[in-house]
Amino acid sequence: MLIKLLTKVFGSRNDRTLRRMRKVVNIINAMEPEMEKLSDEELKGKTAEFRARLEKGEVLENLIPEAFAVVREASKRVFGMRHFDVQLLGGMVLNERCIAEMRTGEGKTLTATLPAYLNALTGKGVHVVTVNDYLAQRDAENNRPLFEFLGLTVGINLPGMPAPAKREAYAADITYGTNNEYGFDYLRDNMAFSPEERVQRKLHYALVDEVDSILIDEARTPLIISGPVEDSSEMYKRVNKIIPHLIRQEKEDSETFQGEGHFSVDEKSRQVNLTERGLVLIEELLVKEGIMDEGESLYSPANIMLMHHVTAALRAHALFTRDVDYIVKDGEVIIVDEHTGRTMQGRRWSDGLHQAVEAKEGVQIQNENQTLASITFQNYFRLYEKLAGMTGTADTEAFEFSSIYKLDTVVVPTNRPMIRKDLPDLVYMTEAEKIQAIIEDIKERTAKGQPVLVGTISIEKSELVSNELTKAGIKHNVLNAKFHANEAAIVAQAGYPAAVTIATNMAGRGTDIVLGGSWQAEVAALENPTAEQIEKIKADWQVRHDAVLAAGGLHIIGTERHESRRIDNQLRGRSGRQGDAGSSRFYLSMEDALMRIFAPDRVSGMMRKLGMKPGEAIEHPWVTKAIANAQRKVESRNFDIRKQLLEYDDVANDQRRAIYSQRNELLDVSDVSETINSIREDVFKATIDAYIPPQSLEEMWDIPGLQERLKNDFDLDLPIAEWLDKEPELHEETLRERILAQSIEVYQRKEEVVGAEMMRHFEKGVMLQTLDSLWKEHQAAMDYLRQGIHLRGYAQKDPKQEYKRESFSMFAAMLESLKYEVISTLSKVQVRMPEEVEELEQQRRMEAERLAQMQQLSHQDDDSAAAAALAAQTGERKVGRNDPCPCGSGKKYKQCHGRLQ
């Protein structure tokens, strides 16, 4: 009560922020007449003037009023569009490392031009981040004329672009691209082998569009660059045949409970567990298929990989549904983003799950991958010096933005008051009744000329509604991941009178639904439109626009509640843009996933007690409250998962930053010889310590072991035992010095042969490759540690503290291994004398010529052409890989002429 009273008197934090910013808006408005008097050249010249002032030490914040006034005036001249006062407020919020909540249709794209221009003046680059390539390209091309008018360069960063084009895009003042591409470029830059291969500059200012989608919905999904490991596709196929024999165990309180099943499914945590009965059956089936020996247990350490295959296959069959979680297109399993309904081409599930789904669908199984580099969006975006974002729905997640990203959320008021009617939810007993009610509502709305947008949470549901509409004879468009290319065109015309559009989740987000349809899209479809044609199109559009407004504006139908209230609000936000009329309603059933998993059983019990007849709906504040509570439960659970993921990833992130920083330093220097010398001393000291403990008696020394180790690991053949016999005065310290001196001498002789420059280049390459190889193994080890660390809780230990402690000791061990591997590799490298190299090269050329002649004798296309030619020449059978080579060298064929193929 007291807090409410204080807020009434002093205003909320949001009100105080906006009050402070409105004073700056008044200053910008006062500058408008002055800006209007400037010629185009004088307006363009302001950019150079601002940059000069910054170089002299002026603070960026001091330029806000004038810079925003310049952008507003330039926008009027280039686009014929003037920034509203609320857009100026939004621009200031975005410059202050905050999240700006701006409703759909309030012009977020135009608002973004203000902070983008201001922060680009520093010359350090601005990254505008969008959710897909289409929006990145659209926004870049739309805003390019404005920025170029003001003397700034614009770049677009798209997947598949060659490195030089990417470098050029990043060198621009303002770069547009997707969150995935920025993250992958960062990882690729940290795998580069020369400074020239890197494309990104230092990360300065990121302006994230649809910030909730990127920083919250996708926060649990790490970006991973992976490489293939050995082929195990056959095992996935064999295990996949077994899974259909297993029966799912239903809950005991459900109507379909039929005694004990073989596996149970936890839909909340998306996990599958074998029951005891299931374990017995699957072991029998594995033995029958010849995959496992009689009497063996699936849980024995020897079968750990087999258990991995069984779990992956079970999850693929029980938890992942075609046209909901993925689609199959051109013989390929493509993931569908659960948040946007869009396909994620090129993205694959890890831990063998993708291969298990491929086996289930009978498509070609691609190899499993090993992580080479990975980062979460949470940690990538926190690398920027300055981060800001905008969205239509952020207030529900304000706490998360604040606690994880240290970003405050400011709700920017709308330019015109919102008049959309949000109708109460209707709850039905069954899915079929709900779908029927939706069809009736659509018929009623379209009969009076009102356009309808139907939001579904999966492709499967969108196709179910589509089939029912087709049966009812209602014309409609479907907007889901299967029809990616037509997305913008369908959305643009979704505001036509009586138009019906079905959209999965938020597919098509970023394109406004204009009441009456988009006249711009109609003009764009004409080849060379005349002024008369354009006027006629505009006049026709105005008639349609007025008719739709009279019918009640765009009506939104939600076919079920999403896990997050924010995503429901995004769907609602498609209607009622810029003060237009509109309405929305959600239709639910007790069979919906959210209701089934999270709504208490008493809700369905209460509905039964009310004696509801088929087709009847319940509309009660209690039910609405129960649904809101269910959503809150899911949101808080998802927040905890993301928070926990971040706490664990922060440990890996500290190590990642240390490795990448070290790697970049290594890339930027040309001479690493000092580092090599320092490492050599450490490595030899540790190696000798293992066999000659410091300050120990000679009787405790293991000289044969030390000699063998030096020979095997460092190619250093030293007569240490002989030295000790011949030189009694040789003590521990002098012996250490002599071994190190000998290793340096051998290395210097190699350097004299190849030259210092070549040796420095080689040293750098070895260090980079060894670092990458060990870092890759370390990441895999960290993943394994992470998966099992929760079990430490049973021993009354804090899993997070244990993870920190163990990962730190693993990291320290990796750094020691790095030193050892580098010195071992450099010591073992064989350097040929120039004349030896020439002789070997001569032999190689002669063998290549001889092979070429032999290949001319044969016109076979297969890989055994050379072998067949040799067989023909010598009158012998076809030569096997392990047979002696027919050329008479005495070597095996695979090590002689077979190798040259």
From Swiss-Prot:
Signal peptide location: none
BP-aspect Gene Ontology terms: intracellular protein transmembrane transport; protein import; protein targeting; protein transport by the Sec complex
Cofactor requirements of the protein: Zn(2+)
Swiss-Prot/TrEMBL induction comment: Repressed under conditions of excess protein secretion capacity and derepressed when protein secretion becomes limiting. This is regulated by SecM.
Matches recorded under Pfam families: P-loop_SecA, SEC-C, SecA_DEAD, SecA_PP_bind, SecA_SW
Keyword presence, Secreted: no
Residues covered by region (Disordered): 859-901
GO terms under cellular component: cell envelope Sec protein transport complex; cytosol; plasma membrane
Chain residues that bind ATP: Q87, G105, E106, G107, K108, T109, D512
Enzyme Commission designation: 7.4.2.8
Catalyzed reactions per annotation: ATP + H2O + cellular proteinSide 1 = ADP + phosphate + cellular proteinSide 2
Biased composition (Basic residues): 891-901
Record note on cofactor: May bind 1 zinc ion per subunit.
Compartments it resides in: Cell inner membrane; Cytoplasm
Residues the entry annotates as binding Zn(2+): C885, C887, C896, H897
PANTHER family recorded: CHLOROPLAST PROTEIN-TRANSPORTING ATPASE, SECA INNER MEMBRANE COMPONENT OF SEC PROTEIN SECRETION SYSTEM
Function text: Part of the Sec protein translocase complex. Interacts with the SecYEG preprotein conducting channel. Has a central role in coupling the hydrolysis of ATP to the transfer of proteins into and across the cell membrane, serving both as a receptor for the preprotein-SecB complex and as an ATP-driven molecular motor driving the stepwise translocation of polypeptide chains across the membrane.
HAMAP family, per the entry: SecA
This protein's name: Protein translocase subunit SecA
